[in-house]
Amino acid sequence: MSNNVKLQVLLRAVDQASRPFKSIRTASKSLSGDIRETQKSLRELNGHASRIEGFRKTSAQLAVTGHALEKARQEAEALATQFKNTERPTRAQAKVLESAKRAAEDLQAKYNRLTDSVKRQQRELAAVGINTRNLAHDEQGLKNRISETTAQLNRQRDALVRVSAQQAKLNAVKQRYQAGKELAGNMASVGAAGVGIAAAGTMAGVKLLMPGYEFAQKNSELQAVIGVAKDSAEMAALRKQARQLGDNTAASADDAAGAQIIIAKAGGDVDAIQAATPVTLNMALANRRTMEENAALLMGMKSAFQLSNDKVAHIGDVLSMTMNKTAADFDGMSDALTYAAPVAKNAGVSIEETAAMVGALHDAKITGSMAGTGSRAVLSRLQAPTGKAWDALKELGVKTSDSKGNTRPIFTILKEMQASFEKNRLGTAQQAEYMKTIFGEEASSAAAVLMTAASTGKLDKLTAAFKASDGKTAELVNIMQDNLGGDFKAFQSAYEAVGTDLFDQQEGALRKLTQTATKYVLKLDGWIQKNKSLASTIGIIAGGALALTGIIGAIGLVAWPVITGINAIIAAAGAMGAVFTTVGSAVMTAIGAISWPVVAVVAAIVAGALLIRKYWEPVSAFFGGVVEGLKAAFAPVGELFTPLKPVFDWLGEKLQAAWQWFKNLIAPVKATQDTLNRCRDTGVMFGQALADALMLPLNAFNKLRSGIDWVLEKLGVINKESDTLDQTAARTHTATYGTGDYIPATSSYAGYQAYQPVTAPAGRSYVDQSKNEYHISLTGGTAPGTQLDRQLQDALEKYERDKRARARASMMHDG
């Protein structure tokens, strides 16, 4: 049998052993996908149910609004008729009539919106197969589908639980197999311990220097963004600032350098970077948002209000106080200020006043862009009112500009408008009319909130608090970091500072070493280009070595079916107690040693080379006795591993030369014959004792099997007269196929059964593998292919089929 055929047999065995894992993994993935699809369908069905509920609510609102509209129309018509029939209508009657008309118009607008909403919902429901004219029937059908989908989801989840349980069982089998190979892994670990220590030390050193490496990378990026020389005063100042922030705050120097890059990309110069970096870091620690978001907001407000670099810290404090004193969060405040800040600057409103307006609107649940557009509309309408807005303000007696044409303080204007409403005792409808005329439909609600906040003094209090907020962000960060988490961050920052300092000291040497290595690699590349043939030969040799390593690794997989068989023995005899389990595990570990890597063997040999040289002959005599004792005790078990022997023949031949060279290298020291005999006898005794311990599970299993056979015989399940059928069938099988020829159908040598895991004979019976031969002589001879010849073949085949049918009917066969 060739080496390629051997490898194919091994790979096929591995594939068959791993097939249950693959099938269960595939089933698990399929079930998970089905569950996701069912969950998606269930969400869609629940969405349809929500649409039905929304349609009903909207329809109910439409009906109520329709009744109210009809009533308002009747009242307006009655008032109009009364007003027309009155000779001298009063001003109060005119106002009442106008109010009734406006109420009817508002109800008509609301009725139209609800009608459009109902039609839109009808179209959406129709798109998913729900008819609103037969809503109760379709809703019941939808509920039935939801119930069916829910039941299907529960069934799929139960199936997934069962598959997961099977996966857990197979994983337990695999873990037992891995435990059997643990001894081989320990041998490999001994050989790799020195390399592992060196690698761990190297990785620890690299990890310690990594903060300095990353800090240097970010400094180079910052230098490229701002466009200055590496040794310039600007870069030195920025680097010094980043290091100081890393040493004195919870942020690291790497974080500070990252913030500097973000501010530089936002358009900041060196002075702006130095001013904004500490503020950005503190804001990020305080509001737990990214440095990119905080830097963008900070620099955006600085640009919108056209403030100098020395005001950047104050801007950060105002923003932090806004989030702490009002209901505004980071996203809402950022969106609102994006809309309001440019208009506020043109209207002469400070950043503190703008933040107060945004915070007050967030307290009233007008958030994000709605707060921004509302504030912007209020500022722009009051800064330069035109048309009806101007007339309305004039009627209220409110001036928006002073004698020089400059816009008066916005808060003062809002207070005067609220005071005018109260002075003239305007009703809510009249106030709403003025608000819509002055500020527009969308901004009227925001204007009402701001007028109330201005009249109650809330805006003034917030503005005063924001103006006195210097240093509040740093104070907030100190409070938030005054705990174990903050101490850990400070420790991490200090640790990274150590790595940065070490990297700074070694950067020159490391760069020189790397550059030198690069030069040598380039020289090697040039040599390869000049010597293509030789380089190709080296590549072929390396590929052959890799293939040899793969073959040796595949040989280790032979242990899998053997371990499976031993596991089956342990499972069948588990009731025999902890002693059997312990010894059975020892057997499993011993067989797992088949897969010892060659590298681990070499490492073990090298580790003990000096001791072996000194005590070579006593050691060799001792282990020679051990091997002799093991061979004598394991002779009956040898046939079990006979199919594995040819696999190791080729590997043994290749290693024999290397082993002979190693023996010659360590020139053994001679010992006396008596000493060697004593060592050999001791080895024989040790080997026999070891073999007895390893044979204990098999002996116990044989006793268990004998007991089961006795019970089955007494019950009449088996017949003792059939004891010799195994030997008879084996002789027939050997005589039929011969010996020494490879049979691909069973992947084994003739005369040996293919390996199967050993199992307890619970309910199994004899499988007839004999072959019948019939010799029929006819006088006169019969040529092959004639009608008589075909009739004989048909008769024999029919006889064989009937025989197999009778055997199956008797229930005495497993096949």
Swiss-Prot record:
Q: Spell out the coiled coil positions from the record.
A: 67-163
Signal peptide residue numbers: none
| Keywords for this protein | Coiled coil, Viral release from host cell, Viral tail assembly
Keyword match Coiled coil: yes
Do you know which Pfam families this protein is assigned to? PhageMin_Tail
Entry's Gene Ontology BP terms: viral tail assembly
Record InterPro entries: Phage_tape_meas
Family, per entry: Belongs to the P2likevirus tape measure protein family.
Q: Which NCBIfam families is this protein grouped with?
A: tape_meas_TP901
What is known about what this protein does? Serves as a base for tail tube protein polymerization and acts as a template for tail length determination.
Q: What is this protein called?
A: Probable tape measure protein
Native organism is Escherichia phage P2 (Bacteriophage P2)
Name of the coding gene: T
